[in-house]
């Protein structure tokens, strides 16, 4: 678990109450009751090196031992979990933009925009048990809106 006092843990759900979880190195979205898994307790820390008005955050999984990253490929931006400790990112020990997401408020919901790929947002899959992706979507939808439920 992350030892920094400002670390906050959340269970992140979509509009249909499906929660984020990790399995086999992938970030998935599903129903904990029917999919037989435990929701991921996502550790969130701010990225102090970017404009605070955009609410830049790091998303740490598995107790903060790996983080969600946006990687540029020929096919477009790709989400992946990387073995990078969230505390190291917070302390500024590595290039951090690809691990940063801007938390955009929509009332009680949020959209998560990849700092490394402006205009690309975290998006829940259309099919169950598929990886969470990035989409270039200008308007909010139920696939790009997420709710943060405090955990611990």
UniProtKB/Swiss-Prot annotation:
| Keywords, sorted A to Z | Cytokine, Cytoplasm, Secreted
Location of this chain's protein in the cell: Cytoplasm; Endoplasmic reticulum-Golgi intermediate compartment; Secreted
The entry lists its GO molecular-function terms as: cytokine activity; interleukin-1 receptor binding
Q: Kindly list the biological process annotations in GO that this record carries.
A: immune response; inflammatory response
Q: How does it assemble?
A: Interacts with cargo receptor TMED10; the interaction mediates the translocation from the cytoplasm into the ERGIC (endoplasmic reticulum-Golgi intermediate compartment) and thereby secretion.
Indicate the family of this protein.
Belongs to the IL-1 family.
What protein am I looking at? Interleukin-1 family member 10
The organism is Mus musculus
- Provide the organism lineage as a comma list: Eukaryota, Metazoa, Chordata, Craniata, Vertebrata
């Amino acid at each position: 678990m992350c030892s920094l006092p400002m670390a906050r843990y959340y269970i992140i759900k979509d509009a249909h109450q499906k929660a984020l979880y990790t399995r086999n190195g992938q970030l998935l979205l599903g129903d904990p009751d029917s999919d037989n898994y435990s929701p991921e307790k996502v550790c969130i820390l701010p990225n102090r090196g970017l404009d605070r008005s955009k609410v830049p955050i790091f998303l740490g999984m598995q107790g903060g031992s790996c983080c969600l990253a946006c990687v540029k490929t020929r096919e477009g931006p790709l989400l992946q979990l990387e073995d990078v400790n969230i505390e190291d990112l917070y302390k500024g020990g590595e290039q951090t933009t690809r691990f940063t997401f801007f938390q955009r408020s929509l009332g009680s919901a949020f959209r998560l925009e990849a700092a490394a790929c402006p205009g690309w947002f975290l998006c829940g899959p259309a099919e169950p048990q598929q990886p969470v992706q990035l989409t270039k979507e200008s308007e909010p939808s139920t696939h790009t809106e997420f709710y943060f439920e405090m955990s611990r």
